[in-house]
Each structure stands twice: as C-alpha cells, then as structure tokens.
C-alpha cells in the first residue's frame, strides 16, 4: 500500500514505515502530523483524486528538524569586477509515516 501526498509544494510517494524529509513544518520532535492532501492512493486498487482523494489522510510522527547542507550561490559579471557570493541552508523536517488512512 502506498500513497502520493503533497506538502510544501512538492509531492512524495510514501508507504507505512518510510522516513522522508519534507519542508519545515514548525512542529517539535515527537509530535504527530497529518497530511490531508492525498493525490493518489493504492491499496490493491489505484484511486486517483480530483485533485485529492476524499476522506484519505496520512498520519506521521516528527523525527527531527534540521538544516540541509549549505548551497553556495555565486554571481559574476566579467570585465566589470562584479561578483557576489551567498550561502543558503534550507530547513527541513524529517517524518516517519505511521499509517495511511483510506
């Protein structure tokens, strides 16, 4: 059994027991979260939502929150001497999928 959920502007294919990184949710570790935007549900039979599957949700437990590795953004224009260096670390929340409610 698997489901495709949408959170943080991205889509994730999840099954029970999976651990995934999603965009920061702002919830402390150990808390339970529910994802209600289930786009596709497969429990032996594929159900595609329009745009979401009615009555379906995915419950998960927050494992940790953190930041990804730093990404360096470097802008450069030749001949003029212009250059600019920026760094960015995106925050994430790691969750463990507990149950897919159909």
From Swiss-Prot:
The keyword Ribonucleoprotein applies. GO terms for cellular component: cytoplasm; ribonucleoprotein complex; ribosome. One of its GO terms (molecular function) is structural constituent of ribosome. SUPFAM superfamilies: L21p-like. Keywords: Ribonucleoprotein, Ribosomal protein, RNA-binding, rRNA-binding. InterPro entries: bL21-like, bL21-like_sf, Ribosomal_bL21. This protein binds to 23S rRNA in the presence of protein L20. Part of the 50S ribosomal subunit. Contacts protein L20. Belongs to the bacterial ribosomal protein bL21 family. NCBIfam families: L21. HAMAP family: Ribosomal_bL21. This is Large ribosomal subunit protein bL21. It comes from Lachnoclostridium phytofermentans (strain ATCC 700394 / DSM 18823 / ISDg) (Clostridium phytofermentans).
């Amino acid at each position: 059994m698997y489901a495709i959920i949408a959170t943080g502007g991205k889509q994730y294919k999840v099954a029970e027991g999976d651990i995934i990184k999603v965009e920061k949710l702002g919830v402390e570790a150990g808390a339970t979260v529910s994802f209600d935007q289930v786009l596709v549900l497969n429990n032996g039979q594929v159900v595609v939502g329009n745009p979401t599957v009615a009555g379906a949700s995915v419950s998960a437990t927050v494992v940790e929150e953190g930041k990804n590795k730093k990404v360096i953004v470097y802008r450069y224009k030749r001949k003029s001497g212009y250059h600019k260096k920026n760094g960015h670390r995106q925050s994430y929340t790691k969750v463990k999928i507990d149950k897919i409610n159909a």
